[in-house]
Every structure is written in structure tokens, then in C-alpha cells.
UniProtKB/Swiss-Prot annotation:
It is a peripheral membrane protein. This is Glycylpeptide N-tetradecanoyltransferase 2. The lineage of its organism: Eukaryota, Metazoa, Chordata, Craniata, Vertebrata. It catalyses: N-terminal glycyl-[protein] + tetradecanoyl-CoA = N-tetradecanoylglycyl-[protein] + CoA + H(+); N-terminal glycyl-L-lysyl-[protein] + tetradecanoyl-CoA = N-terminal glycyl-(N(6)-tetradecanoyl)-L-lysyl-[protein] + CoA + H(+). Transmembrane segments: none annotated. Gene3D superfamilies: 3.40.630.170. It comes from Danio rerio (Zebrafish). GO terms for biological process: N-terminal peptidyl-glycine N-myristoylation; protein localization to membrane.
Amino acid sequence: MAEDSESAASQQSLELDDQDTCGIDGDNEEENEHMQGSPGGDLGAKKKKKKQKRKKEKPSSGGTKSDSASDSQEIKNPAIPMQKLQDIQRAMELLSTCQGPAKNIDEATKHKYQFWDTQPVPKLNEVVTTHGPIEPDKENIRQEPYSLPQGFMWDTLDLSNAEVLKELYTLLNENYVEDDDNMFRFDYSPNFLKWALRPPGWLPHWHCGVRVSSNKKLVGFISAIPADIHIYDTLKRMVEINFLCVHKKLRSKRVAPVLIREITRRVNLEGIFQAVYTAGVVLPKPVSTCRYWHRSLNPRKLVEVKFSHLSRNMTLQRTMKLYRLPDSTRTPGLRTMGDRDVKQVTALLQKHLSQFHLRPVMGEEEVKHWFLPQENIIDTFVVEGSGGMLTDFISFYTLPSTVMHHPLHKSLKAAYSFYNVHTETPLIDLMNDALILAKLKGFDVFNALDLMDNKNFLEKLKFGIGDGNLQYYLYNWKCPPMDPEKVGLVLQ
């Protein structure tokens, strides 16, 4: 946002009156940036957090405890009542514990969730044993968009327009999810965005943007796509919320809350009142918590960009040998999925997913969209047995990350495990072939969550555990929490 007019607009306060604003968390806009259906904030594997340097405190001349300074200050400043000082101290302690989004349950219990406390979601400390909506479906839904402050405007993004698609790509590429050390940022390609945002049943007004009125620069975005989701024994028409992004120069200016409220209004107008989403931070209240695992395919590059590090007593050469893969796959009948396979893949997928508590329901149109291979977007391979019968399939999608601040490497090509079904071939053999195929296609790392059956192969195939979780959430629906192996839903 370099232009003068744009900079001026960005300085305007986005604080709206109560009737026109909302927030995922009214205290922390950064938390809002982490609410997404994408693979969380765990872009780096097993990286240690940078230690904050602390200045050493000089001992007092009297050899008393370090907090004696505050005691003496109370004596030296009789105009400040002790109660006031204690209030200030408590406020400072509260600030120190609540700065930044909560990464785990312990941090979350100390966090204030002003927005979520008003929303139809379970409280963090609530023990949920029932199933069903938290609020009934609304009958009277606001017809007009929520108001934005002067200088900003709503815009429904037409992703069939190449220029608009490029604008969205640029916004996400420069402002979307980064790892904790600001070394990697997701790099969704324009064609990937069209794939992720235009499945069967998509609606154009669910691609919700915010622009600067003066120069029409895109500075905010949120999306919803329709999905039929099974939650335990209940089938609900929902939306998947994804790609919530606000320009960095507008952070802490209450843009994300308005985006959330507006997409909720637009979804409600279509008669849908439940949503599913994922986040790398802890909000009230996760229905499940999964962990990312990473399998090195190009160890040299991963070490050079500090995505991973050499283990103790391991040289680079030994590490490369450890992760070396065969040059060809081993499963007989393994081939690329084609149009003729859609019907059988749909049947395999539906039967496989029926064992999980949280799962999508996909017909042939959805399977055709999500699984038919597209270069640098989605790869699917099927195993064809005798008589043309399909027995298994594997799939993974492509999501590179921009490597920041590195003189040589600018991008990290990552494969993300999507849906894998096995009936004849052992899962570990299928996934080993998936690693080989990804390596042959030039991927640097293969990522997988520990959901569905994935725990059966992660350690055996030399995946390393990542340093972040991915929480699954339901909006306006309560149900008992579930273990990762009962989650059968993967969001981009």
C-alpha cells in the first residue's frame, strides 16, 4: 500500500458502532488471520522458537529480593495508592499472557475471547455431550451488507476475470499465513484458488472482498464454499470458511470482524446456518486437534532454508541417504486417475469415509472436481486390479510456500496428503509410492495430518512431527470432541 491515497485510507479507524461490527476475537486481529481452512500455521518442521533475550537485573545493594524495587516505589510515591499499583500490575500480567493468539489449550485458558463469548460455539471449558445446533435457524436475516467506514467498499470478486484473480493471488501471497518465525508464507497459485473456491454449487457472492474506495486496491477477503458434512450421525448442509486475509497495514483495525459478519450474513441468506473451518490457533472450541507431520524429499534444500535441521550426530550426507527413495513405484496397476474412474473412486471414497465422525459427502460431481488431476494443483493415482476394478487410490495437492530472506531459494514445493483409500494394497505401500511420485514431480516435502488412518504410516515412512497443531471447528453446532483418527475431512 505505497500510494499516498491508499496510505491515508489505511489510517482510518475501522472501529464501527456495535450494531455494525463483529469479530472472531475482538482483542486480537492476528488471531483472525489464522482462521482458515488451509493447512494451519505449521509451515516449518521442528523449528525451535527464537528465545527472547532478557536483560539481567542488577541485585540491589541491600541484597533484598528483586521485587523490593516495587515495594520501595510504593513508599516513595505515597500519592499512588497501593490498590492502584496492584491494579496496574494485574493489568500488565494480563497483557503479558494475552499478547498474540493462543497456540495451545493452556494459553487459551488465559485468553479473553470477547467475540466468541457472544457466538453460537461451545465455551472452552464446556463439556459437550449432546449433538445439535446451538441456535435455531434465523427467520429474519439482514438484507443489506454491513457498513464499512468511509474510504472502503465491498466487492464481490469475479474469479473468472484474470485480473481479479491475480489481485487475490497477490493479496494472499503478500499477507496470508506465515510460520511463527516469518520465514515461509503460503503461495496459493491463481489456478489453485479457482480449484479451491469454485467447487460444484459455489456462489459468486461468497467470494467477499474489501477494497480501498479511492484506488480500488484489494485489501481484504474471505470465502465460503458449500459442503455436505456428516457430524457423527447427522448430515448437514454447511459451508467451509477459508482464506480470511487482511492486508498487513490494516491489521488491528477491525477489518476481519466485519468480513466474518458479512460472510455469515451472505451464507444465512442461502438458508445455511452451520460452518466448518480450521485454524492454527486455539479458539472456542475445537471439535478436534490434529498435528502436521513432514516427510523430507529434498533434505539438502530443507536444511538450507531452515525448514528442518540436522539431527545430532547426523551429517547432511547421512540425512540424504536416510530419506532416499526408489526411482519407481512398486504397486502393480498404479496409474493416474482419469475421467472414466470417477464413478469407482466415488464409491470407494464414500465407503471409506463412512467410518469417520466428521466427514464430507461427495457425489460424482464433487469427486470429479476435487480429484481429477490438474498440474500443480491436485494429483490422484488409482490402483486398477483385474477386470478394470479399482481397489485403492491416493491423492495429494500442491501448495508451495514462499521462502523469505534466502539468497538462493525462493520457493518450497510442498505436497499435502488429501484422501487415501486402501482395500487391497497395504496403506504403507500406497503412501510409499505417493512419496516416490511426489519426489519424481519435484516436491521438496510431503506433509500429512495425523487424521483418518494416517498414523499407521507416519513414523514407519520417516515422517517427522511438526511444531504446530491444526484445530477443527464447527460454527453453530455442538457435539462431543473426537480424536484425530476419527476426522475424515481435509480442507485446503
